[in-house]
Amino acid sequence: MPVTTQQLIQWKQQGRSIVALTAWDYTIAQILDAAGVDLILVGDSMAVMLGYKTTLPITLEEMLHHAKAVCRGVQRALVVVDLPFLTYQESIPQAINSAGRILKETGAQAVKLEGGYPAMVETITRLVQAGIPVMGHVGLTPQSVHQLGLRQQGKTQETAQRILNEAIALEQAGVFSIVLEHIPADLAMQITQKLSIPTIGIGAGSHCDGQVLVTSDVLGLSERQPPFAKVYTNLRATITKAVQDYAAEVRDRQFPE
């Protein structure tokens, strides 16, 4: 049975941890889905896989293209798609149009927006009222890299309280889940205990209701990993060796036999 947003909320109540990873193409999405991943995020982190330095340059059209491929490979997991930078911040109508295109054109079940400041809370409220499921995202928000950098957020009492307040406001706005990125574990635990919707941590400790990582980090494909990522295998080295072996056999006329 396909995973739903309401099912994720039920899993929080039952104490079942939610498994989430990113995907940007059909093959990886198919593998993740078959392996039992609950939530697949078509993240704007795809920008880095496309050679950009940050997530900011990626466009809505690029996200639509890749999200379609991901959805074609998924049968069970809930698919959530990031709205890229400046496709939802200008106005509520812009946000509704961007999010609506994601759901209509890709087959994804939800969108994710960064930030919990008042204007964003209002935008998310309107999206939910329009029937669009929304996942929130607080803490380190990569689309604000030029304002906040990539350092851990919520380390002071003031910033921790702000992030907690944002999470509460997002729940009240109607999000079905919230990503907590690169914040102290005790703050993530406090937010998780306060909310009735599931929290998905990335660099936020073990007390969240689920965890998400960038799949290229997990597989060892990334040139650099964030400090909170865990590399489970080194596919970069495996692929390099396989290509070198193939090239050697072609040059030595050993392939094809």
Curated annotation (Swiss-Prot):
Q: Please give the Gene3D superfamilies that the UniProt record associates with this protein.
A: Phosphoenolpyruvate-binding domains (3.20.20.60)
Keyword Transcription tagged: no
Q: Which residues bind 3-methyl-2-oxobutanoate?
A: D44, S45, D82, K112
The catalytic activity, as recorded, is:
3-methyl-2-oxobutanoate + (6R)-5,10-methylene-5,6,7,8-tetrahydrofolate + H2O = 2-dehydropantoate + (6S)-5,6,7,8-tetrahydrofolate
Q: What class of enzyme is it?
A: transferase
Q: Where is the active site?
A: E181
GO terms assigned for molecular function: 3-methyl-2-oxobutanoate hydroxymethyltransferase activity; magnesium ion binding
User: Which cysteines are cross-linked by disulfides?
Assistant: none
Q: In which pathway does it act?
A: Cofactor biosynthesis; (R)-pantothenate biosynthesis; (R)-pantoate from 3-methyl-2-oxobutanoate: step 1/2
Question: Among its keywords, does the record have Metal-binding?
Answer: yes
The entry's Mg(2+)-binding residues are D44, D82, E114
**For this chain's UniProt record, which GO biological process terms are given?**
pantothenate biosynthetic process
Q: Where does this polypeptide localize? A: Cytoplasm
Record function comment: Catalyzes the reversible reaction in which hydroxymethyl group from 5,10-methylenetetrahydrofolate is transferred onto alpha-ketoisovalerate to form ketopantoate.
The record ties this protein, via PANTHER family, to: 3-METHYL-2-OXOBUTANOATE HYDROXYMETHYLTRANSFERASE (PTHR20881:SF0)
HAMAP family for this protein: PanB (MF_00156)
Its quaternary structure?
Answer: Homodecamer; pentamer of dimers.
- State the protein's name: 3-methyl-2-oxobutanoate hydroxymethyltransferase
Q: Which organism is it from?
A: Trichormus variabilis (strain ATCC 29413 / PCC 7937) (Anabaena variabilis)
